[in-house]
Amino acid sequence: QARDAGIDLRFSVTATDFSRFQITDLCSLFANALENAIHACEQIPSPKKRYITLKVYEKNNRICIHIANNYIQNPVFEDEIPVSHETRHGIGVKSMISVVEKYHGVYGFFTENGEFRFQASL
């Protein structure tokens, strides 16, 4: 889907031990995060300016996840969480938070200089 939208997608995954996680939880987390990033990038008129980066690494026996993408339409936040008022949207972010909290992790959503970032440590 990202390739079809002309999005420059870059991955760096150095973490190797995911054994303590249910695969469905990880799939849900990454699928929702990437779907949101793709949706934001698709709004950018020039495909050459669209990008998503994903980094997954281990630090202090935790899995750290950083996903960043550019955007054109400023995200709306309520209580430091991005929200969508479109029908059937916003459930993905709640699902992401649920997965992070299930593994007693911490997360954050940030914007800076036209870049949206999701960071989590599980």
Per-range role (PLM):
Residues 73, 112-119:
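Glycine-rich nucleotide-binding loop
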Residues 104-114:
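Glycine-rich ATP-binding loops of the HATPase_c
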Residues 49-61:
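Short beta-strand/loop element within the Bergerat-fold HATPase_c
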